[in-house]
Amino acid sequence: MMKTLQTLGFIAASMMVSTTFAADFSFDRPWAGMGTGITPVGHLAWEQGLPSVSYQQDNVAGAKDKTLTLNADMLLRTGLADGLELQLGWQGPVWQQYKHAGTKKETNGLGDVSIGLKKAINLKDDRLTMALLAEAIIATGNDEFTAHDDIYSLTSAVAYEFSDLIGTSITMRYEAQNSDWAVTAVPTLDYKIAGKLSGFSEFIYRKAESQDYEYGLGTGLVYAINDRAQLDASVGVDLNGSGKSYNGGFGVSVLF
């Protein structure tokens, strides 16, 4: 009897620890920036676009040039050790429609894959958190949906929680493709709206070597089903250039 009680007590304690870890965990979807949460050891996080959408419109030779792209991007995250996780990503199946001067073309294929290691940095502050991500995007996708050359990047994220209602963060991403460099900065403001519903707003700045500056705005909503699952919806707009460019989509994230 005593042995049975000890076994049940151990199982209950394990469940309590698991629940605590799940409560402290945070997903990286859907913002352009990166969160500072790390997947607990023994758990798997699945973050899935349902789908992600982008739309570009420009004038070429006096005619409207429109491109609509849908892709079911996904990210798998699993804890390797305390404060360290492995990330495996895929841009997913992609469908694209191109319209120009009364003509229409549709293509579909597969996007690139990625692999990364994310490490939490202990700042010894209850409100201030930090994480680093070393990532490689491997150009394995079809010709229309690939970066063509591998991209290697180092990303840092620092977040500060002002209260239970509002927080802010800054993400810096440094990437190299062949001998070309690019840097991206994403300051983000996240806020609780009501109950399980929260929102975020962000500004995206990017400068690639030998390219013009790029700017964008993004905002979205996140509904926490529970500590282990959430739904999200987001929309963004690019501010550079004379054409129109929008992005957004829906997604679901689950921690197993």
Protein language model regions, located:
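Cleavable N-terminal export/targeting peptides
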Residues: 1-28
